[in-house]
Amino acid sequence: MKKSTKLIVALLVVVAALAVTYRLMHRVPSADLEANAQMQQLITDAGCLRCHTSTPDLPFYANVPVAGKVVMEDVSKAYRAFDMTQMEKALKAGQPLNPVDLAKVEKVILDGKMPQAKYYLVHWGASFNDAKKKVALDWVKNHRMGMYEDISVAPEFANEPIRPIADSIAVDVRKVVLGNLLYHDTRLSADNTVSCATCHGLDTGGVDNKQYSEGVGGQFGGVNAPTVYNAAYNFVQFWDGRAGTLAEQAAGPPLNPVEMACESFDQIISKLAEDKNFVLAFNEVYSDGLSEKNITNAIQEFEKTLLTPNSRFDRYLKGQKDAITENEMAGYELFKKYDCATCHVGEILGGQSYELIGVQHDYFADRQAEMTEEDNGRFKQTQAERDRHRFKVPGLRNIELTAPYFDGCIMATMDDAIRAMAKYQLGIELPQEEVDKIVAFFRTLTGEYKGQLLTNKNENTL
């Protein structure tokens, strides 16, 4: 074969290879596919499920000594940060996705962080070009739009990861009245000294502003009291998620030996039954009378009314441009820039997922305090190692009123909490100017209760 012929053949082979590579790199899911199927193809082609799952599909070079170590480190970090298993199942089943999953996927695509270059340079076609990004981001937007019922958001903010709080949630007013009475009733405790409001005061931001709440007999629990305001928006209750509903949550403290210390709900019912007027009112609403189920149901119904809408930031999202300042708006942009809005999403800026504390640095080692059972977080309930130190993400509504912060309350100020999150979750140190702007944004999240700006009678001590 002549040299010229060989050269032509070689060039044809190169051109063919380049054509195949180009098609792989620019392949976009068919428009004939349903939207979820398009997204499923994108994350499959990008290799997301090779790392972000408990059963990673490792590439052949994972067995190569040097490369294998890097692969295993990347897989471990990926799975710790984001398990995409449930997202994949939801896509296949055509079910709604968790808003946190949407926010995480959206952010890495916008930032161009995933897949990493060291992956797509080996796996041609894994990278996201502009066409793929458009398909993915349109899918996120449409899915998010269908997730929220609120239609009062200004059009330009319709795709924001944060939504305004509703003015109200549908409730049975008769049950609310009973729930209000029970919420403030110390007879739910063994020694008649502690009520729900003792640790979740409605005049103290829905918390008690203490590191640990004090129960019967001067005993102290192992975590701080999360705010009761807007708790109806949490996907589960308690830091470790052991209660699926507000009613289940309401059943916990009365029987907790530290908090209210009752032996059973029969003990509570026997005390309430002595109050003839209360029993009469209760029986008018619940035909089967006093019971654990009915008591906790009434408290749940009352807690659904503990919403704090109409914050300045809510008004901004609804189109009132002068509701927040430029400095506060800059704080919100930083909040999104630093991935805060990938976990602190939705109406209450949180409460939609369990997340690991200490992604980049060991938070508990630096804390220099003895580990407790509470520090295990979700692991307490599941015994799954991945859930160790993983907690329900707290909502940030009214955050200026709810200090101290974190489950162990070792962060006294918003400034401290922001710096800690930057260090342990992102591995960075923020300049004071940026911290101040994020704090300013946080102050726009204080809402109204019963038409009045929420305040805290302890504010002078915070």
Each predicted region: which residue ranges?
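Post-cleavage N-terminal segment of exported redox proteins
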Residues: M1-A35, G112, Y120-V177, A261-M329, ...
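Aromatic- and Gly/Pro-enriched helix-to-coil junctions and flexible linker segments
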Residues: L18-A154, D172-R174, L178, L202, ...
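Short glycine/threonine-rich turn/loop motifs
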Residues: R23, Q41, D57-Q86, P155-G252, ...
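Charged/polar, solvent-exposed surface patches and flexible loops
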Residues: Q41, D45, K69, E73, ...
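Sec/Tat-exported extracytoplasmic proteins
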Residues: G47, H52-T55, V75, I109-K113, ...
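Axial heme c-ligation environment in periplasmic c-type cytochrome domains
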Residues: P56-Y61, A81-L102, K107-K132, V228, ...
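Short runs of predominantly hydrophobic/aromatic residues within well-ordered alpha helices
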Residues: L102, A225, E292-T296, V393, ...
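Extracellular low-complexity, Gly/Ser/Thr-rich intrinsically disordered linkers
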Residues: N398, Y405-Y449
